[in-house]
Each structure stands twice: as structure tokens, then as C-alpha cells.
Amino acid sequence: MKNDDLYVIQSDNTGMIKIGRSINPEKRLKQLQTGNPNKLKLIASFEGLGWKEKMLHEQLSFYRLEGEWFSYECVGELPLNIYEKIEWGALDDWWNNN
């Protein structure tokens, strides 16, 4: 049985960050996008690390907005191994062209 992946999704309009877990982060993105007026992008996923979700939610609790959504300012508090996997330059290009 496959372990859940940890994923990081960002909203284009608000910059909000969602940290969650799913067996299929791409499918989860599509579910979240349905009915959401803001464009969402999967900005990072980590195979088999879904078990770290709760720890990250606790670590970032100061930045929590609602449920699993956090203000953009939380990125400075992300563990280095997660922060470094996000391709920030490519992300800027994506938001600017969509």
C-alpha cells in the first residue's frame, strides 16, 4: 500500500499556501480547484511524507488562516528541505502568464 504524499498548493490571488496529504496530489489539486475562483498550483509534493503534515501544521500554526490554509508568510518557516524543492522562479513565471 502506498503511503500518502505531502503536498504544498498555492492560490494565485491570495498567495495562501495549503499543506496537506494525499495518495494523489494532482487529483487532490483538481478536487480543490473545482468551484474555486482562484487558480491553484501544486508547487511541491513529497512522496511518502504525508505523515509530516500534522507536524508542519503545528509548526506553522501562527500563520494558519483556515483549516489547512496558511498565509504566504509561512514560507519563511518551512523546513529547508521543503522550501528548497519549490521552484520559486518557475512559480513566478507561471503566475505571471496565467
Kindly label every feature range from the protein language model.
Residues 1-98:
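Non-catalytic accessory segments flanking enzymatic or RNA/DNA-binding domains
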